[in-house]
A protein has these predicted regions:
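Active-site-proximal loop/short-helix segments
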Residues: 154-190, 229-235
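Substrate-binding cleft/loops of secretory-pathway carbohydrate-active enzymes
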Residues: 206-280, 310-328
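Active-site-adjacent "subsite" loops/lids of carbohydrate-active enzymes
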Residues: 82, 86-147, 181-199, 207
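Glycine-rich, aromatic-flanked loop segments that form ligand/cofactor-binding clefts
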Residues: 65-119, 151-161, 213, 217-228
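Aromatic-lined carbohydrate-recognition surfaces of secreted/lumenal glycan-active proteins
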Residues: 25-33, 81-85, 153-157, 192-241, ...
C-alpha cells in the first residue's frame, strides 16, 4: 500500500461477481496506470483505471493531461475508469494554497511525537475535512466525469491508529463530540473515541464524494459507478489502521470494491500454534475471503487485486513464489 503505485502499476484485477451483475457489467479484468497508452503496458484487459487527474505522486513524468491520457486509451478500445486516493494523492495544489489561497499541510495525520505521517514527498495522509472534500469534488470528480468517465475508484480510506494529534483532527473532534479533544494515549476510552472519529471521517468522506459523483453524473445523463479499493480488515488490524470498511455495505452510493491483497499484505507474519512466521498463502486466503464476504448480502461487485511484485525490494524468485501463493489463494 505505502509504495505500491510505481511509475506504472501493472496489477491486473480479476473479478468475482454475481450472475445478475454480469448481465449489466461485463468488465472482469482491469488494471491501473498513471501513464498514457504504450505498447509495453497494453495487456488487453477489459478496462483501464487511469490514475489521478494529476497522475500518481510516484510518477514524475506527467507529460500529458488527464484528458489526453484518457483519449489515448479510449482510442485503443478500452473502457475507461478512474482511480485516485481518498487518504493521499497528487493534491499539492490543495496543500500549497492554490485551491483556496490557504495552505493545508496542517491537515495531515500527526502522531503523538508531532510527526506528520507521509505517503510521499508533499503527500501526507489526510484528515479529510469538509474543505478537502469540496476540493476533491470540484477539482477532481467533476473533471473526471466531464471527460466521460463513469466509474470512479477512491482507494484506501485509511486513518493510522497512531495518528490523532493534529490541529485539524482536534477541530473535527470538537465538531463531532461537542467537547474538547482528549489525547488517545491517556485512556482506553479516549482511544475508543479517537478511533470512532477516524472511522466516521472516512465513512463521511466516501459518502459525500460518491454521492456527489452520482448526482453530478446524473445531471449529465451518466450512471456513475463508485468503488472502494481497500485492504482487508485482517491486514488493517495487523498494520494498525482504522478503516470504515465494515460499514460500507450501509452506503447506497458504493457499488463495489477492490480487494487489495498482494504479497505485501499477505506476508505479514502472524501466529499459529505459538509460532510467528510468514504464511503467505494462508493469510491471502483469509484476506480474500473476508472481503468476498462483504458482497454476500449486497450482490456488489468485487475485484480481486493480483500483483506480481510488492512494495519492498526482493529478488525475483521471492516475488514469483509469493505471487503464485496469493494468486492461488483466489
Amino acid at each position: 500500500m505505502k509504495q505500491k503505485h510505481f511509475l506504472i502499476s501493472l496489477a491486473v484485477l480479476a473479478t468475482g461477481i454475481s450472475v445478475s451483475a454480469q448481465t449489466k457489467d461485463n468488465v472482469k479484468t482491469t488494471f491501473q496506470t498513471s501513464r498514457e497508452w504504450k505498447p509495453s503496458i497494453d495487456n488487453r484487459a477489459d478496462a483501464v483505471m487511469v490514475y489521478g487527474v494529476g497522475g500518481n505522486p510516484s510518477d514524475k513524468s506527467r507529460k500529458l493531461s488527464f484528458e489526453d491520457r484518457v483519449k489515448s486509451w479510449k482510442e485503443r478500445g478500452y473502457i475507461i475508469h478512474f482511480m485516485t486516493g481518498i487518504a493521499w494523492g497528487e493534491y499539492q495544489d490543495y496543500f500549497t494554497g492554490q485551491w483556496d489561497g490557504k495552505w493545508h499541510l496542517d491537515e495531515g495525520q500527526v502522531t503523538q511525537a508531532g510527526d506528520t505521517i507521509w505517503h510521499g514527498h508533499m503527500v501526507p495522509y489526510i484528515v479529510p475535512s469538509e474543505n478537502f472534500l469540496s476540493y476533491l469534488k470540484e477539482r477532481h470528480v467533476k473533471r473526471v466525469i466531464d471527460a466521460g468517465v463513469d466509474a470512479i475508484f477512491m482507494e484506501e480510506p485509511e486513518f493510522w491508529a497512531r495518528a490523532g494529534y493534529s490541529e485539524s483532527f482536534k477541530k473535527e473532534w470538537k465538531k463531532y463530540y461537542g467537547f474538547d479533544w482528549r489525547p488517545q494515549h491517556e485512556s482506553p476510552e479516549n482511544t475508543y473515541l479517537s478511533s470512532k472519529l477516524k472511522y466516521y471521517l472516512y465513512y463521511r468522506a466516501l459518502n459525500e464524494v460518491f454521492t456527489f459523483a452520482k448526482e453530478y453524473g446524473k445531471s449529465k445523463g451518466m450512471d456513475v459507478k463508485c468503488y472502494v479499493p481497500t485492504h482487508s480488515l485482517v491486514n488493517y488490524s495487523q498494520w494498525q489502521i482504522v478503516s470504515p470498511e465494515a460499514s460500507l455495505a450501509s452506503l447506497p452510493c458504493v457499488d463495489g470494491y477492490i480487494a487489495q491483497v498482494w504479497t505485501g499484505t499477505s506476508r505479514e507474519p502472524n501466529f499459529f500454534d505459538g509460532r510467528k512466521r510468514e504464511r503467505v498463502f494462508e493469510t491471502a486466503y483469509l484476506e480474500y475471503g473476508s472481503m468476498e464476504s462483504m458482497t454476500a448480502p449486497t450482490g456488489r461487485k468485487m475485484f480481486f487485486l493480483t500483483d506480481p511484485i510488492e512494495d519492498w525490494p526482493r529478488d525475483w524468485a521471492d516475488y514469483k513464489k509469493n505471487y503464485q501463493a496469493t494468486f492461488t489463494a483466489q
